[in-house]
Regions:
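RNase H-like nuclease fold core
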Residues: 8, 13-59
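Amphipathic alpha-helical
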Residues: 1-5
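RNase H-like nuclease module associated with reverse transcription
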Residues: 12-13, 52-166
C-alpha cells in the first residue's frame, strides 16, 4: 500500500477569514485581529494579535484586520507559486463587517484618516489586480471570530464543528 498521493493537485483555493475585536485591550484601547487562512480545506495559517495602533472605530479595527489578511493572501500566493502550484483564481477573504465589505468593494469610496486611506488603497490595489476577492460572511460563520473574543461553549462547539467538517 502506497501512502504517498499519486495525483498532483493542479490548483488550490485560498480562503482567508479575518475579524477584529474593537478596543479589546481595556488598558491600551488596542483592538485584536484574528486571521485563519485555508489552502484547499486545510488551515495553514492562524494568528491572533493585538493591533499596533489604537483605532477610534470598529470600522478602523476591521479594516486594519482586512489589510493584514490581504498581506497573508499575497504571501500564500507567492509561496504556493514558488512550489509550482498554479494560482489563477483570486484568494477569497471573508469579513463580517458590512461597512468594510462595501468600502473594500467600492473603488469610489474615500477615507479621511490617512492610515486607513493607505490600507484602503493597498486593499483596493489587490482587489483590482484580481489577487483577492472580498466576501461578506455572517459573524456566526466567521472562523476567525474565535481568535478575537471569548465565545460561550455552544458557539465555540458549533464553530469548531464547522471548522473541522468543512
Amino acid at each position: 500500500m502506497n501512502s504517498v498521493p499519486n495525483k498532483k493537485v493542479k490548483e488550490l483555493d485560498i480562503n482567508i477569514f479575518c475579524d477584529a475585536d474593537h478596543a479589546h485591550d481595556l488598558v491600551t484601547g488596542r483592538s485584536v485581529t484574528g486571521i485563519i487562512a485555508f489552502v484547499g480545506s486545510t488551515p495553514v495559517y492562524w494568528k491572533s494579535t493585538r493591533q499596533t495602533s489604537v483605532q477610534t472605530s470598529t470600522f478602523g479595527s476591521e479594516f486594519t484586520a482586512l489589510k493584514k489578511a490581504v498581506e497573508v493572501a499575497v504571501s500564500l500566493r507567492y509561496y504556493l507559486r514558488s512550489m509550482g502550484v498554479q494560482i489563477s483564481k483570486p484568494a477569497k477573504i471573508y469579513v463580517d463587517n458590512k461597512s468594510v465589505f462595501l468600502n473594500a468593494a467600492n473603488p469610489a469610496s474615500s477615507l479621511n484618516k490617512k492610515a486607513l486611506a493607505l490600507a484602503y488603497h493597498f486593499v483596493r490595489e489587490h482587489v483590482s489586480g484580481n489577487v483577492i476577492e472580498i466576501q461578506h460572511i455572517r459573524s456566526e460563520d466567521n472562523y476567525a471570530d474565535c481568535l478575537t473574543k471569548p465565545l460561550n461553549s455552544t458557539m465555540l462547539r458549533n464553530l469548531l464543528y464547522e471548522f473541522m467538517t468543512n
